[in-house]
Design a protein with these regions (language model features):
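Charged, glycine-interspersed solvent-exposed loop segments at helix/strand-loop junctions
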Residues: 114-131, 153-164
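Substrate-recognition "cap/lid" segment bordering the active-site pocket of phosphatases
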Residues: 76-78, 84-101, 155-185
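Active-site phosphate-binding/coordination module
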Residues: 33-119
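Substrate-recognition/cap helix-loop segment adjacent to the acidic, metal-dependent catalytic center
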Residues: 59-76, 133-153
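A structural signal for isolated positions on well-ordered beta-strands in alpha/beta enzyme cores
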Residues: 13, 52-54, 74, 153, ...
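Short, basic/aromatic recognition patches
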Residues: 1-5
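Mg2+-dependent phosphoryl-transfer enzymes with acidic/Ser/Thr/Gly-rich catalytic loops
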Residues: 9, 35, 166, 171-247
């Protein structure tokens, strides 16, 4: 979109992906580090927006709480399979034995450069950038999912494949948050970097909101774009400076 991305307005509701969006991408998810300055920015933005700031990620809620501790924000984890708003926690897709069946042939590869994250309701399979594992996984995983009970879908992301329940996506997570305070009645703004964020973009746009794509992959539907997570963090800081009262 032509023009300059506006700063955050007080009537917005922010929905933020984590890896590759708020934080620079790393090949091993356990290696990511959340700067204390980012925790402080998110906490202050949440206060300025009346609590209408949520994390929407492929990571589990437990992992997100660990990363951002002691900050405790509204979150949707596992691509929207689970979500928390206040003290209310919803699981939108129960676990299925089919997930273990899908993962079994991946474990059987015994490939040390493949990392399998079984998150309970979903899974992520990470592979090395320079290796041939992607080709093997691209052939194996669709076959494994086809042999399952049809409860899961396969999503390709950066150096990973996500196995996610069919019934969930990040857009539905946005809709769930927007149904109640403090999100209801606000302008939704979804910020992400991958194909798995497209449903979130669509949900925000359908409600008259904004969609912001971060990083080298260009979205087909997000009107706004930021080159890097560093640019996003700088924009959040600039916005916060205008939202907070002068000292």
């Amino acid at each position: 979109m032509a023009g300059t991305l506006p700063i955050i307005a007080r009537d917005w509701a922010l929905f933020l992906d984590v890896d590759g969006t708020l934080l620079d991408f790393v090949s091993r998810p356990e290696a990511v580090i959340v700067p204390q300055s980012l925790r402080q920015t998110l906490a202050a933005l949440s206060r300025a927006l009346g609590g209408a700031l949520a994390i929407v990620s492929g990571r589990s809620i437990a992992d997100l709480d660990r990363l951002f501790a002691p900050l405790r924000l509204p979150v949707a984890g596992q691509h929207g399979a689970e979500a928390r708003r206040g003290e209310r926690i919803c699981v939108f897709a129960p676990g299925s034995p089919a997930l273990a069946s899908i993962l079994a042939p991946v474990y059987a590869l015994r490939e040390p450069t493949i990392l399998i994250e079984n998150k309970g309701l979903s899974a992520a399979i990470h592979y090395a950038e320079a290796g041939s594992e992607r080709d093997a996984l691209s052939e194996l995983l669709p076959q494994a999912i086809a042999r399952s009970d049809g409860a899961y879908q396969l999503l390709a992301s950066h150096l990973a494949f996500d196995i996610v329940p069919h019934a969930v996506n990040k857009g539905r997570a946005v809709d769930w948050f927007m149904a109640d305070a403090p999100f209801a009645g606000r302008v939704p703004v979804f910020i992400g970097d991958e194909r798995t964020d497209e449903d979130g973009f669509a949900a925000a746009l359908a409600r008259g909101g904004h969609a912001i794509n971060v990083g080298p992959r260009r979205s087909n539907i997000a009107p706004w774009h930021m080159p890097t997570p560093q640019d996003l963090r700088a924009w959040l800081d600039r916005s916060l400076a205008t939202l907070e009262p002068s000292q």
